[in-house]
Amino acid sequence: MQVRTIREQVRAMQRHWPDFVVAEQLRDKVVWFGSLAGLERMYRVMIEYGLPREAAPPTLWRRFPVIRVLSPRLEPNFDAVEEAPLPHVYFTDSDITLSPLCLFDVEAGEWSHNDLIALTTVPWAADWLACYEGWRAIGRWYGGGRHAAIPEEKAS
């Protein structure tokens, strides 16, 4: 499997999402901050991504790009008809409002390290935000997908 370099990912983000700012860039890791529009409001998000490393302890952001909504915070709805308390997220943080978004099924091949984050993950996150706003309004998730299990040791 070919793996895109961090430099390739950064260049693609600059080209397609110029308002996203690189907050940290190392040889094998990058973090961006930027804004995405839902249907009714803007959201400030963070994207964390790292190249896979066999010798390193497994972390979620080395398996795939991790997107968290920073503001406004995700609002849990424990009474939602479906997907309570939050739809399609990975519950890896003690603060569930900062849970990484579940945007694709890695095991089903929906994303790989050869994909450009700017052309896959970011547009999918914008779509997720629109579906999230619908879920907030009616308590049903219309974003599709299935929950991919993340082994506990890979969630850190």
PLM region descriptions:
Residues 18-106, 116:
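Compact alpha/beta protein-protein interaction domains typified by the UBC
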Residues 83-156:
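Domain-level detector for trafficking modules
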Residues 1-24:
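Order/disorder boundary and secretion-linked terminal/linker segments
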